């Protein structure tokens, strides 16, 4: 039996609260069960030096966890004087995922930064960050259109992510912390709204997994992401 009696293919309740803060062009509080992440999208005119003069935009991301988002307090990385490898890996993943959602040529020479701050962690913080940041990004892009900075919205479609894994020999979708810490296999999957894969991060924590198990996990992820995209679109229609 999974926590909260979920079936193996069931994601936790997902909530997306838009316009959560007043200053950012896009802001969303995303909740996957007890995992809560604040995602903001900030627009700046201009692009990084390596893109200057190419007539295209850029999307980047930063990720961080509040000191008491976890069971015991973790010192802020700013206080340590450097970012950890996990943080850098996750923010690069978020940025790659969100760049797949946008026509960067149509964006023009704007940079959009997605800041994902974990308020409470109970597994799946990176997948929640991608899911919430995509909605914040959609709001920011719409503001560019409304303000006359862009003629058309460069958003190609929604992008969402979910974790899957093998726990006690069973393939499950959207792992909570207690499942994640006991998983034999742990995988994060990012997809477009039509089911095309952007990224798969998979690791055998204990027992190596088979090709058949990989296909099962990808199918589980696709089903979970389809339901998450429905929630994203409903939030944006509100």
From Swiss-Prot:
<dbReference type="InterPro" id="IPR015847">
    <property type="entry name" value="ExoRNase_PH_dom2"/>
</dbReference>
<protein>
    <recommendedName>
        <fullName>Ribonuclease PH</fullName>
        <ecNumber>2.7.7.56</ecNumber>
    </recommendedName>
</protein>
<dbReference type="Pfam" id="PF01138">
    <property type="entry name" value="RNase_PH"/>
</dbReference>
<keyword id="KW-0548">Nucleotidyltransferase</keyword>
<keyword id="KW-0694">RNA-binding</keyword>
<dbReference type="InterPro" id="IPR001247">
    <property type="entry name" value="ExoRNase_PH_dom1"/>
</dbReference>
<feature type="binding site">
    <location>
        <position position="86"/>
    </location>
    <ligand>
        <name>phosphate</name>
    </ligand>
</feature>
<dbReference type="GO" id="GO:0000049">
    <property type="term" value="F:tRNA binding"/>
</dbReference>
<dbReference type="InterPro" id="IPR027408">
    <property type="entry name" value="PNPase/RNase_PH_dom_sf"/>
</dbReference>
<dbReference type="InterPro" id="IPR050080">
    <property type="entry name" value="RNase_PH"/>
</dbReference>
<feature type="binding site">
    <location>
        <begin position="124"/>
        <end position="126"/>
    </location>
    <ligand>
        <name>phosphate</name>
    </ligand>
</feature>
<dbReference type="Pfam" id="PF03725">
    <property type="entry name" value="RNase_PH_C"/>
</dbReference>
<dbReference type="GO" id="GO:0006364">
    <property type="term" value="P:rRNA processing"/>
</dbReference>
<keyword id="KW-0808">Transferase</keyword>
<dbReference type="GO" id="GO:0008033">
    <property type="term" value="P:tRNA processing"/>
</dbReference>
<comment type="similarity">
    <text>Belongs to the RNase PH family.</text>
</comment>
<dbReference type="InterPro" id="IPR002381">
    <property type="entry name" value="RNase_PH_bac-type"/>
</dbReference>
<dbReference type="InterPro" id="IPR018336">
    <property type="entry name" value="RNase_PH_CS"/>
</dbReference>
<dbReference type="GO" id="GO:0000175">
    <property type="term" value="F:3'-5'-RNA exonuclease activity"/>
</dbReference>
<comment type="subunit">
    <text>Homohexameric ring arranged as a trimer of dimers.</text>
</comment>
<dbReference type="InterPro" id="IPR036345">
    <property type="entry name" value="ExoRNase_PH_dom2_sf"/>
</dbReference>
<dbReference type="GO" id="GO:0009022">
    <property type="term" value="F:tRNA nucleotidyltransferase activity"/>
</dbReference>
<keyword id="KW-0698">rRNA processing</keyword>
<keyword id="KW-0819">tRNA processing</keyword>
<dbReference type="GO" id="GO:0016075">
    <property type="term" value="P:rRNA catabolic process"/>
</dbReference>
<comment type="function">
    <text>Phosphorolytic 3'-5' exoribonuclease that plays an important role in tRNA 3'-end maturation. Removes nucleotide residues following the 3'-CCA terminus of tRNAs; can also add nucleotides to the ends of RNA molecules by using nucleoside diphosphates as substrates, but this may not be physiologically important. Probably plays a role in initiation of 16S rRNA degradation (leading to ribosome degradation) during starvation.</text>
</comment>
<keyword id="KW-0820">tRNA-binding</keyword>
<dbReference type="InterPro" id="IPR020568">
    <property type="entry name" value="Ribosomal_Su5_D2-typ_SF"/>
</dbReference>
């Amino acid at each position: 039996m999974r926590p909260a009696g979920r079936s193996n293919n069931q994601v936790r309740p997902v909530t997306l609260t838009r316009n959560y803060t007043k200053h950012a062009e896009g802001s969303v509080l995303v909740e996957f069960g007890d995992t809560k992440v604040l995602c903001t999208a900030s627009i700046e005119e201009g692009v990084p030096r390596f893109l200057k003069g190419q007539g295209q935009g850029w999307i980047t991301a930063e990720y961080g966890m509040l000191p008491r988002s976890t069971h015991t307090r973790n010192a802020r990385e700013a206080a340590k004087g450097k970012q950890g490898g996990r943080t850098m890996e996750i923010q690069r993943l978020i940025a790659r995922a969100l760049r797949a959602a946008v026509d960067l040529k149509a964006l023009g020479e704007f940079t959009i930064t997605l800041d994902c701050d974990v308020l409470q962690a109970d597994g799946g913080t990176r997948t929640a960050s991608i899911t919430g940041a995509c909605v914040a990004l959609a709001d920011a892009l719409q503001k560019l259109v409304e303000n006359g900075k862009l003629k058309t919205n460069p958003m190609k479609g929604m992008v969402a992510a979910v974790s899957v894994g093998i726990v006690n020999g069973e393939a499950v979708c959207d792992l909570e912390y207690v499942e994640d810490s006991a998983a034999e296999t742990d995988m994060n999957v990012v997809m477009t709204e039509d089911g095309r894969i952007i990224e798969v991060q998979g690791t055998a924590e204990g027992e190596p997994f088979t090709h058949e198990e990989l296909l099962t996990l990808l199918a589980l992820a696709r089903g979970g992401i389809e339901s998450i995209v429905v929630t994203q679109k409903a939030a944006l229609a509100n």
